[in-house]
């Protein structure tokens, strides 16, 4: 018997909505990464993108444990000499809360072309409104 490898037409991608309010960042990110990879499906194959679309709401209301609000730092570089900028998690949640969840999930996905394809299926919003109601997303509870 040959090993089954899913084709593009065999993969049924669904849309899910996650409310991130009062959820711990790392635990939420692992669940989202598993959905994006498709690890919860029977047809999971490491070299094929079998994952679903995930819409995350209330990204600004996530929780973290310990002192991470003040101690966890995010770095970016402006590509100019001396242009290394750093922000704490507290500042990031005030300015760009979407980036916090995207960064956490991106770190849990493969670091190759497939990972870039998977992260495009993640949609993160700070409020409760999102433009993906036409896809009729299912509510996902963790």
Curated annotation (Swiss-Prot):
Domain of life: Bacteria
Alphabetized PANTHER family for the sequence: LARGE RIBOSOMAL SUBUNIT PROTEIN UL13M (PTHR11545:SF2), RIBOSOMAL PROTEIN L13 (PTHR11545)
Chaperone among keywords: no
Its biological purpose: This protein is one of the early assembly proteins of the 50S ribosomal subunit, although it is not seen to bind rRNA by itself. It is important during the early stages of 50S assembly.
Organism listed in the record: Maridesulfovibrio salexigens (strain ATCC 14822 / DSM 2638 / NCIMB 8403 / VKM B-1763) (Desulfovibrio salexigens)
Gene Ontology terms describing biological process: negative regulation of translation; translation
Alphabetical list of HAMAP family matching this protein: Ribosomal_uL13 (MF_01366)
Example of a GO MF term: structural constituent of ribosome
Name of the featured protein: Large ribosomal subunit protein uL13
Record-linked InterPro entries: Ribosomal_uL13, Ribosomal_uL13_bac-type, Ribosomal_uL13_CS, Ribosomal_uL13_sf
GO cellular component, one term: cytosolic large ribosomal subunit
Complexes and interactors: Part of the 50S ribosomal subunit.
Similarity field: Belongs to the universal ribosomal protein uL13 family.
Cross-referenced Pfam families: Ribosomal_L13
